[in-house]
Amino acid sequence: AVYMVRYGIGDWAPTYLQEKSIMTAAESKVAFSVHNIVGAVGTLACGWATSKIFKGRCAPMNVICMFFCLLGVLLYWMVGSGVIAASPALQKTLIYIALCLIGFFIYGPVALTGVQALNLVPKNAAGTAAGFVGLFGYLLGDAVCSKILVGGIAVGSSWDTAMLSVAVGALIGVFLCALLIRSERNLAKSNA
């Protein structure tokens, strides 16, 4: 779900923004670049908060990040679909806000899912766990969900439906990340 959101927005942002006549090709590239720059800052902030506030537990931070990412995806979808009617200038501003929200909050969970896998398995299985998280993240989240599912929905139905499917992916991400809170709490108690 995390990779679906990352790549569902990342892979399609320039095309989506141009086909919806929200931005020109040059403007959409700048917006996507800002999304990535803000994402780098968000990754650092997420790592810091995980260490300092949640004492190394990744799940609570992932839930928070995925929730705010969901809000960003919903804003992105609502502006693009016309649910939020706005002037072209306000539309671009709202898209920038949405892309910044998504960027800031999605790259933390992307980084932390691998760390989380390392923390939750025995040390002798750490490499395998990290490998599986990466493999399935890219195969299912990027290749299947982002490229095939989101792209197929955009072509077969509409961009509005495609972006709504990314929002559903973000919502699923919130719930999947929340499922690990108890496991991390129990692990922290057993290591104390």
Which residues does each predicted region cover?
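Extracytoplasmic gate region of multi-pass secondary transporters
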Residues: 1-43, 110, 141-150
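A late C-terminal transmembrane helix in Major Facilitator Superfamily
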Residues: 122-156
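Multi-pass alpha-helical transporter architecture, strongest
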Residues: 76-80, 159, 164-192
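Cytoplasmic membrane-interface "Motif A"-like loop-to-helix N-cap segments
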Residues: 51-66
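C-terminal ends and interior cores of transmembrane alpha-helices
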Residues: 67-87
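Hydrophobic core of transmembrane alpha-helices in multi-pass small-molecule transporters
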Residues: 88-108
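Intracellular juxtamembrane helix-capping segments at the cytosolic ends
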Residues: 107-122
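A membrane-interface helix-boundary motif in multi-pass transporters
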Residues: 57-60, 148-170
